[in-house]
Design a protein with these regions (language model features):
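N-terminal amphipathic alpha-helix/helix-capping segment at the start of soluble metabolic enzymes
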Residues: 1-21, 79, 251-254
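Structural preference for beta-strand elements that scaffold enzyme active sites
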Residues: 18-22, 51-55, 89-93, 110-111, ...
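Glycine-rich, proline-tolerant flexible connector loops at the mouths of alpha/beta enzymes
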Residues: 21, 25-34, 52-74, 220-231
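Active-site beta-loop-alpha junctions enriched in small/polar residues
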Residues: 25-28, 57-61, 97-99, 117, ...
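A short alpha/beta connector and helix-capping loop motif
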Residues: 34-38, 42, 101-102, 106-117, ...
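Alpha-helix-loop-beta-strand connector modules within alpha/beta enzyme cores
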Residues: 41-48, 67-93, 128-138, 188-196, ...
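Catalytic beta/alpha-barrel core
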Residues: 71-73, 87-101, 110-124, 137-149, ...
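Catalytic alpha/beta core domains of metabolic enzymes, predominantly
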Residues: 131-219
Length: 254
């Protein structure tokens, strides 16, 4: 399986590498809360000697209600993420929703995420692949809930043809099981790894960690007051204990 690197940050993900931790907020709220969360997670993961990429979305474009909080938007959101990156010296992960956002997002984010619902959108995939490769970043592609793990081969092929390079991390986040329900088929992780890409698992939605190369986790200092997906967020105060356990599990199964 391919081991991918972010040379600027001396980070690697793949077989034999430390547990790769993409962690942060579901959505950006304000700069103070963002800095509080990023600082705490950096301190925890530095102590545990685990690679850390700070994640936060600038726009939650698929909220169920038009009245729901979506985020600060691309211009203000990317400025906030750039400030976190500069002040804390940490790599950034964020997602995008439209092809025309690719260049701007790739200029700030080291790990550019394509949301699960959008992975079949060829124009978005191609534009994101080209912009991210040009910026020397990595792609983080969430497997759609309606896709079989082996169908990710087609997504990887599009990216390869668009950018002529292998720089994609796949993410397992569950599969549709009837209406309004998700299940996690643990075989999916190995199935996707057999496609040649490292695999993370969105553990705050899937709540499992069997053999993945990394984790994608969303935290909040006070989940009950989070402006988006509070019930799916983990309390920031528990981050160190959780990552310490995950590090031990990774060491035991490696």
């Amino acid at each position: 399986m391919t081991v991918l690197q972010l040379p600027k940050w001396s980070l690697s993900i793949g077989d034999g590498q430390p547990l790769f931790c993409i962690a942060g907020l579901n959505v950006l709220e304000d700069i103070d809360l963002t800095m509080q969360t990023a600082t705490h997670l950096k301190d925890v993961l530095t102590r545990l000697e685990l690679p850390f990429v700070f994640k936060a979305s600038f726009d939650k474009a698929n909220r169920s209600s038009i009245k729901s909080y979506r985020g600060p938007g691309i211009e203000k959101g990317l400025a906030m993420l750039a400030e976190v990156k500069q002040r804390l010296n940490v790599p950034i992960c964020t997602d995008l929703h439209e092809a025309q956002q690719a260049e701007a997002v790739a200029a700030v984010a080291d790990l550019v995420q394509i949301p699960a619902f959008l992975v079949r959108q060829t124009d978005l995939v191609v534009a994101t692949a080209r912009a991210t490769h040009k910026a020397c970043g990595l792609l983080h592609v969430k497997k759609a809930q309606f896709l079989a793990p082996w169908d990710c081969r087609n997504i990887l092929s599009k990216i390869k043809e668009a950018a002529d390079a292998d720089f994609t991390i796949l993410c397992e986040r569950g599969s549709s099981f009837g209406y309004n329900n998700l299940v996690v088929d643990m075989l999916s992780i190995d199935e996707m790894k057999m496609l040649g890409a490292p695999v993370t698992i969105d553990a705050t939605h899937a709540v499992q960690l069997p053999g993945a190369d990394g984790v994608f986790l969303e935290f909040h200092p006070d989940p009950d007051k989070a402006l988006c997906d509070g019930p799916s967020c983990l309390p920031l105060s528990g981050a160190e204990d959780l990552f310490r356990s995950l590090k031990a599990i990774r060491a035991a199964v490696a």
